[in-house]
Amino acid sequence: MKYISSKVSLLLMCLLLVGGIAQAEAVKGVKQKPAKKAELERCRRGQGSAELNINNVRARINTSGNMWYDGSTARYFVPKDGNSTAMYCAALWIGGMDANDQLRVAALRFGQDGDDFWPGPLTVDRNASIDKSVCEKWDKHFIITRAEVEYFVAGFEYAADNKTVIGIDASRATDAIKNWPAHGDVSKNQSKFLAPFFDQNGNGVYEWEAGDYPYYDLSGELCPAKIKAELPAGSTYTPTPTFESNLENPNYGTGGSLEAYGGLLVDQVLKGDQTIWWVFNDKGNAHTESKSENPIGLEIRAQAFAFTMSDEINNMTFYSYEIINRSTFVLTNTYFSQWVDPDLGCAADDFVGCDVERGLGYCYNGKATDGPGTGAYAGNPPAIGIDFFQGPYMDPDGRDNPKVDTNAFIDFYGAAALDAYRDSVGNINPILLTDDAYKWKNAWYPKSKDPIDACAINGVNFGNGIVDDERFGMRRFIYYNNDGTANNGEPDKATDYYNYLRGIWRDGKRMCYGGDGYNAGSAGYQEGIYSDFMFPGTSDIWGWGTASNGNEDVGKTTPWTEQTAGNSADD
């Protein structure tokens, strides 16, 4: 039997807008006793932290699995030199069913109830295991900047072919370059490859002395759009696999009995002007946060990164996760989410909502001024957004799924409007049509109501001329109340986390459109009209979030916000 480990890549953006899942604050800082006991001889909670600080944001990143939080207070400062924070805490939630129909969940919040994640890579020997010494060794971050790599590469001497490196300037190599965590410990059955690096000679060994370097795509050679544009007409774009997933080069692969599958180098390479890289897992100890009896066997390579720019990107931070299933079983009905607790200055006067078209969750002030409190924002209060803009790759179907549905286009705009996108023989050029997609929003939702093509609304890589590279955007936006006993309150066990991942309340009830989404007596609540996106305002012009039971018109015609629900601005 051939065993493989599968990979998923996720990319999240966090941005502050001046002038995933949301949570509140009543129990923050209150230590609760875990119902499930961690084992002392196994991994302890990660103690490491680092700071993303290259632009106008100063954000704490923890090795324990969450971020923006130091165990008691918020550490996401915008502006970086101020004392106001826009975020409180965030972490990954992942859950699915194994072949025996057993639920497996890995999720974390503040860590007050316990832990589900620990530092370090897992083994690739079909056991997906880790011990305390490995967790402790990897309880740290690796911080690098694009500028120091560019400076190092600028000192290379090349052969006549202008490609082969024949000399380097060692004085240009920083400690971060010299000590890059490119490899796991194969003697301990870890993967041969961990942090991405550019391999000059293809020998599968990180040798900075020979011109290898932490892999920023400096030339754009991995960019799918660039590669596609340079291919001969009719050619198929084939993405470059990661070293682990590259089974053609005998120097690559995991170095263990469990092969890797599905990883793409364009997703794995380093991003940003400043990058924090680290690796963590869900097998280091008992899951005392989610209380999941069954761990998954996930190895997660993470990046936190940011850019220095003169525009809004200077107020943004980004997060990329390469999620690898090191176990030998396949999870089905699997869901991924970024759990986020935003506190915009003063935590007691906030609202949340989402923009379905943009795939964006956001938090905004419920009053004209923020506060009171020393951490409140002065003047016109800002808003903060969280964009889950590159989710998991969708299952392949052999198509370049369209961004614009031509049948819906003809119904709304008429066939003649398509003529501008036809080639000399009358065929529609999907790339040209995609380039103008924002002119034709009514045609984003397919006339067939195909659930796959509908994901083009806020997914990415639709109609780009490349087959099977489509990725999910935001498919749910939910919140829960700060009540550990209510059915729309805080999660307490694995089934609660899994229900929230699927857009279902703790008691299994579907979220409904309007009001608070749960209670029939709340203002605007519409029983039986199920909703995937809570508080979308008027952004779901297609009624996509209510289409599962044929109620598209509700989302198109009835605004839904925390204000229309009669909620009070709070945490």
Outline where the language-model segments fall.
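N-terminal cationic amphipathic segment used for targeting or macromolecule association
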Residues: 6, 20-24
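Bacterial N-terminal signal peptides that target proteins for export
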Residues: 1-11
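Extracellular/surface-associated beta-sandwich interaction domains
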Residues: 24-571
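Bacterial N-terminal signal peptides
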Residues: 9-19
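Short intrinsically disordered, low-complexity coil segments enriched in acidic
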Residues: 2-3, 18, 569-570
